[in-house]
Amino acid sequence: MIEGGEDLTFIARRLIISASEDIGNANPTAFIMANNCFQAVGVIGNPESRIILSQCVTYLATSVKSNSSYKAINEAQMMVNKTGNLPVPLHLRNAPTKLMKDLQYGKGYKYAHDHQNNFVDQEFLPEEISGNKFFDSIKET
């Protein structure tokens, strides 16, 4: 791509996308590496940017991979496109006023930090689509 005359910042931008889409949370440092590569390419320019790009490419190529975040956002967006705007469940709504409290906003909300391992079994989706799962951390890698 470099020898073909492709813009170096375009190459670096594609590396950021690859780090997020193809590697994701299997190695979150890959995203940082790719973003730093993009910034360095913008500062350094030719001809030395080829070395920076090479370092980033080899790091990304040898990293563990996971596309679960990419798949999760696709599934979530497909659900929204299918169902349209659905109301936020009442227990997730903020209740800064007496009226909102009287309307049951926030009632029954479980604050994860008050529970073991900062995890709570709680439905976060609207009733019409409750039970759907877009991401499974067990299958992350």
What kind of feature is each model-predicted range?
Residues 1-119, 125-141:
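Terminal-proximal interaction/regulatory segments of ATP-powered molecular machines
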